[in-house]
Amino acid sequence: MDVGELLSYQPNRGTKRPRDDEEEELKMRRRQAGTRERGRYREEEMTVVEEADDDKKRLLQIIDREGEEEEEEEEPLDESSVKKMILTFEKRSYKNQELRIKFPDNPEKFMESELDLNDIIQEMHVVATMPDLYHLLVELNAVQSLLGLLGHDNTDVSIAVVDLLQELTDIDTLHESEEGAEVLTDALVDGQVVALLVQDLERLDESVKEEADGVHNTLAIVENMAEFRPEMCTEAAQQGLLQWLLKRLKAKMPFDANKLYCSEVLAILLQDNDENRELLGELDGIDVLLQQLSVFKRHNPSTAEEQEMMENLFDSLCSCLMLSSNRERFLKGEGLQLMNLMLREKKISRSSALKVLDHAMIGPEGTDNCHKFVDILGLRTIFPLFMKSPRKIKKVGTTEKEHEEHVCSILASLLRNLRGQQRTRLLNKFTENDSEKVDRLMELHFKYLDAVQVADKKIEGEKHDMVRRGEIIDNDIEDEFYLRRLDAGLFVLQHICYIMAEICNANVPQIRQRVHQILNMRGSSIKIVRHIIKEYAENIGDGRSPEFRESEQKRILALLENF
């Protein structure tokens, strides 16, 4: 290595961390040349530094002058220049590989070629500004060559490749050229990019800042590709990413940006994906999530970022509980006990714990969890939350409506699934203290009935205007209106009316009389409640088998006979 090489050095255009001065630039060059061999060849490096220091002023003048000339003479990026760049990359990659094979124990022999390889990788960042030319990366086999370098012996090279791939797959860039994005994504998926990235992740040391950045950029590649092509999430999880994410989450390391990013990517992989949910369960992922969340049962997150990670983990857990097999794992892992404890501790985690319990107990698959919840004295926890919505919930981003929605859904699930002694214990709660819980139920009923009636009036006005303009109200528009009504409060109201029907069919005269008494006092009618429950029954069972849908509708409508 000589002064000529230093003169020919081009700044790292792709790096996200600009260097402050020439001295820092030289240090970075030495690190990229061979971090792992630094100890053995420190003497040679010192010689280079001395040469640089001797000619520092002259070097800076020449570099500044050449930089100005380059700006003036720089050619616009086109197919020809990209092809030339890719050819240079292939040559330098091959040369470095050849020298490493020829001189495996003499880094000074291949150090220069590694510098050259790193330089051209940095120059290739400019291709990310022209996604229309991505097809050249595929046609000239550059993508496969880049993927091959993910396993390079020098992690500095693999990190440089990861940084480049992250920029090439930036979601905003991908949307600029759908065709170019498709070609690049196909090539990356065909080359099993995630499997190679995971292998690279396994050897990175996050105590080294550059390698920690490499981990972050790797996760960004996965996020970018998952957003552009959601179906690749299943393959990504099966190629070892899900297992690595779980391992990284439970690693005994201080909270950092990478742990937050891991929680985000995990939530993405599990979204609407039963295969990944099942795989997580098989990898003991439910236990990992519960262990990580247990930290927040008595302590609030210390930062906004840590709170975001906590919410991501809760979202992942809720997503997994959509699968019945994971509800069994949740039960065995004492997830109910943890969530119940969080409800009692009144920390920030309480709102999310309530959502988890809702997911764990809903539907016939939640029967075992419902019974266990009563056994661990969960009724003592849930009914105070039913009687009064906490004042502090707005501070943690949860609305009063969301809180009441989850509580009412849990009570509806308990009434649906409980049998025997546990059901009796639940019904007795509605007779305590002069039926105060029935009074609260009716208070919520009128609150949400009013909200839904306001929404219905607005929707009817919109329908009238559409008819007047000659527009057709098709099924899609009707579905949209129904979703708006659900969001306005119909979803909560349906659960409230279902609870009313269940407790009035419980052969407890005191409860039934109180419900009818309050309805009459408010000038309301059983007909309104029946209409709401019928509408609820008609729309139940979405995504389930026709047999379940039919039997559930019959069961719900049967409740109206004795209401």
Curated annotation (Swiss-Prot):
Spans of repeat HEAT: 79-129, 134-176
Residues where N6-acetyllysine is found: 91
Source taxon at top rank:
Eukaryota
The terms describing its cellular component in GO are:
nucleus; Prp19 complex; spliceosomal complex
Q: Does the keyword Nucleus apply?
A: yes
Q: Where is the composition biased (Basic and acidic residues)?
A: 34-45
Give start and end residues of every ARM repeat.
178-228, 229-273, 274-323, 325-363, 364-417
Q: Where in the sequence is Phosphoserine found? A: 389, 545
Q: Where is this motif: Nuclear export signal (NES)?
A: 130-140
Write out the GO biological process terms.
adaptive immune response; mRNA processing; RNA splicing
Main location per the UniProt record = nucleus
In this chain, where does the modification N-acetylmethionine occur? 1
What PANTHER family does the annotation carry? BETA-CATENIN-LIKE PROTEIN 1, BETA-CATENIN-LIKE PROTEIN 1 NUCLEAR ASSOCIATED PROTEIN
In the UniProt entry, what is the domain comment? Answer: The surface residues of the concave side of the superhelical ARM repeat region contribute to, but are not essential for NLS binding.
| Protein name per the record | Beta-catenin-like protein 1
Taxonomic lineage of the native organism:
Eukaryota, Metazoa, Chordata, Craniata, Vertebrata
Q: Which gene encodes it?
A: CTNNBL1
